[in-house]
């Protein structure tokens, strides 16, 4: 984790405060520490850091700027460390900020590594976009997972001209999101738009049929 922190702050320019805030978010979970015996010493680390050593990123929170910054840094670091090896993102998230999610999405598409996505509970709203954006053939869900797509939410107060600007932007975002889901799932944009008019919940088999995932994982055979 120390190597990642050095990379994130020195080479990517990620604010150290953002890393600390993300650590506090993670510590709000029951986050056990791992004692790992090595050849010369014994190392203690939180379980999320240990997972990252195996190229596993866990997104188990609402998507906000702090979370997105760290996940983008993790993706870039792992791509730099070994460009030919897959990265896995486990998703259990209700979604969150579209703009923060865009940062994660674009980074997933930018890096050279294949990115496997695995839904382990719920991938809703922006998290469903990240799920479907995984590398084709490497998008998975556990049997009782739920996937939900819907139109973006927004609201603001201000002058009439400001409201018009905000309305145009949310319509542009809606079109972008539907296009992304369509391009990765194979569903026509018109179908995605119709289904997303209200919360559209899918079971794992329904998500498979829709093209959001490629396979339902029953058992880890490793």
UniProtKB/Swiss-Prot annotation:
Reactions catalysed, as given in the entry: Hydrolysis of proteins to small peptides in the presence of ATP and magnesium. alpha-casein is the usual test substrate. In the absence of ATP, only oligopeptides shorter than five residues are hydrolyzed (such as succinyl-Leu-Tyr-|-NHMec, and Leu-Tyr-Leu-|-Tyr-Trp, in which cleavage of the -Tyr-|-Leu- and -Tyr-|-Trp bonds also occurs)
Alphabetical GO biological process terms: protein quality control for misfolded or incompletely synthesized proteins
Top EC category: hydrolase
SUPFAM superfamilies per record: ClpP/crotonase
Domain of life of the organism encoding this protein: Bacteria
Matching InterPro entries: ClpP, ClpP/crotonase-like_dom_sf, ClpP/TepA, ClpP_His_AS
Location relative to the cell: Cytoplasm
Protein role: Cleaves peptides in various proteins in a process that requires ATP hydrolysis. Has a chymotrypsin-like activity. Plays a major role in the degradation of misfolded proteins.
Assembly and interaction partners: Fourteen ClpP subunits assemble into 2 heptameric rings which stack back to back to give a disk-like structure with a central cavity, resembling the structure of eukaryotic proteasomes.
Name of the protein in its database record: ATP-dependent Clp protease proteolytic subunit
Organism per entry: Porphyromonas gingivalis (strain ATCC BAA-308 / W83)
């Amino acid at each position: 984790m120390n190597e990642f922190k050095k990379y994130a702050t020195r080479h990517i320019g990620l604010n150290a405060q953002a890393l600390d805030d993300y650590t506090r978010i993670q510590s709000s979970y029951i986050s056990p520490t791992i004692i790992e015996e090595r050849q010369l010493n014994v190392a203690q680390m939180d379980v999320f850091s240990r997972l990252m050593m195996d190229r596993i990123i866990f997104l188990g929170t609402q998507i906000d700027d702090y979370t997105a910054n760290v996940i983008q840094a993790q993706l870039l670091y792992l791509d730099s460390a070994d460009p030919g090896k897959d990265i896995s993102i486990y998703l259990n998230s209700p979604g969150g900020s579209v703009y923060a999610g865009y940062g994660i999405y674009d980074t997933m598409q930018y890096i050279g590594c294949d990115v496997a996505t695995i839904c382990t509970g719920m991938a809703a709203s922006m998290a469903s976009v990240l799920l479907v954006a995984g590398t084709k053939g490497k998008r998975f869900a556990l049997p009782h997972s739920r996937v939900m797509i819907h139109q973006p939410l927004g609201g603001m107060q201000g002058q009439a001209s400001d409201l018009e600007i905000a309305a145009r932007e949310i319509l542009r975002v809606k079109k972008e999101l539907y296009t992304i889901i369509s391009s990765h799932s194979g569903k026509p944009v018109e179908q995605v738009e119709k289904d997303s008019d209200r919360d559209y919940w899918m079971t794992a088999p329904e998500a498979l049929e829709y093209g959001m995932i490629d396979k339902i994982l029953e058992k880890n055979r490793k």
